[in-house]
Regions:
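Mobile cap/lid helix-loop segments that gate and shape the active-site cleft of serine hydrolases
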Residues: 71-76, 160-161, 167-168, 172-216, ...
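Primarily recognizes the serine-hydrolase "nucleophile elbow" in alpha/beta-hydrolase
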Residues: 124-128, 133-183
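N-terminal cap/lid segment of alpha/beta-hydrolase-fold proteins
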Residues: 20-58
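Catalytic active-site module of serine/aspartate enzymes centered on a nucleophile-bearing elbow/loop
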Residues: 291-343
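Active-site-adjacent alpha-helix of alpha/beta-hydrolase-fold enzymes
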Residues: 196, 229-295
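Alpha/beta-hydrolase active-site loop
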Residues: 109-129
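Short beta-strand/loop motif that positions the catalytic acidic residue
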Residues: 225-227
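Short substrate-entry loop that stabilizes the transition state in hydrolases
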Residues: 59-61, 67-107, 171, 233-235
């Protein structure tokens, strides 16, 4: 029998109906005892530190790659500890790579080197334990959501499913949103430190590090993009980033009317002709407001801010298999009682 989570109540439907919305509890701030710190050799000669777990089983198992947030590193637990708790309980392998740390240095912030660090973390994990290559998953919120979308576009061949929450789609655009009257705030300053300059629209270095530059290559990847509708007001990333990201990967016939994005953000009301999302109990109290699907890509805007709903994210990923049709129905989800960790 797989071990139960200490902070995540995992049970099957016999003990708790999946349709029951759950009351949120604070996310854990420490890694589970089973998680260890490791050093992963990098192709540039450096050593990438990471948090790691693999069950003792010699059978092939899913691998979850958890991506740290904008200002965090491999060692930062917070809501990312929920990813680890899930893996311990479900018998998955887990790696939480550093990919050059917080996003205020040139090697970080979605650089080629940071992208390669994630690729090499996956390769290293496969050397340590038997990994089911049809079940390699990627998850992140905020800066981790940015990197998740970037990895979906840069290396679509790896992932069985990518869950990206409140991610930045365009670095130059986000810099502009965090510059008021010519004065950059801390996030804009981080970007300037990483790039070596203040980017303007069309800046090639900022564009290369932006998911919009490559998301069209992620069309074959099951990609779940989610964003709280209060983000940008009670949070640092306006949900218009999710709308643009969705359109970047969606087929032309499935794209949303980009002319309505600003109206939606300003009013927080659905534009004419946009239908309310159907119920999705996996979101608990963070009720979906709008949902749209095109091919393997789904957009969900929910009642929330700059945060991830772990229950929805992890249960959706668990349904996906590389090479098989995407699965959107998660009505038989495993309930979690830890939700709502924001990304920083």
């Amino acid at each position: 029998m797989k071990p139960l989570l200490s902070v995540i109540a995992l049970s099957f439907l016999t003990s708790l109906p999946a349709q029951t919305p759950l009351i949120s509890k604070p996310a854990p701030k420490r890694w589970p005892a089973q998680i260890t710190k490791v050093g992963i050799p990098c192709s540039d000669g450096a050593t990438q530190e990471a948090m790691w777990f693999a069950p003792a089983s010699t059978e092939k198992k899913p691998l979850l790659v958890g991506l740290h947030t904008w200002s965090s590193s491999y060692a930062s637990a917070g809501g990312d500890a929920v990813y680890a708790e899930w893996c311990v309980a479900q018998g998955w392998a887990f790696v939480h790579p550093d990919f050059r740390g917080p996003n205020w240095t040139a090697p970080a912030l979605g650089s080629d080197r940071a992208v390669q660090d994630v690729v090499e973390a996956v390769a290293w994990a496969k050397q340590q334990t038997q990994v089911d290559e049809t079940r390699i998953y990627l998850i992140g919120v905020s800066g981790g959501g940015h990197m998740a979308m970037l990895m979906a576009g840069r290396h679509p061949e790896i992932w069985a499913g990518v869950s990206a929450w409140c991610g930045i789609d365009d670095i130059a655009q986000w810099h502009a949103e965090h510059t008021k009257n010519g004065v950059p705030d801390k996030y804009a300053q981080n970007i300037e430190a990483a790039l070596g300059h203040a980017p303007t629209k069309g800046d090639p270095e900022a564009w290369k590090r932006s998911p919009l530059s490559c998301l069209k290559q992620a069309a074959a990847v099951p990609l779940d993009i989610a964003h709280g509708i209060h983000d940008g007001r009670a949070g640092s990333v306006p949900f218009t980033h999710a709308l643009r990201a969705f359109n970047a990967v969606a087929a032309e016939a499935g794209r949303l009317d980009a002319n309505a994005f600003r109206l939606f953000y300003d009013t927080q009301k659905l534009p004419p002709g946009w239908l309310p999302a159907p119920p999705d109990a996996s979101y608990g109290v963070k009720v979906p407001i709008f949902r749209h699907i095109s091919g393997n890509t789904r957009l969900t805007l929910f009642e929330g801010g700059h945060e991830i709903v772990h229950q929805a994210a992890l249960n959706w990923l668990a349904k996906q298999r590389r090479g098989q049709p995407v699965v959107w129905d998660v009505r038989d989800f495993i309930p979690l009682d830890v939700e709502g960790e924001s990304g920083k």
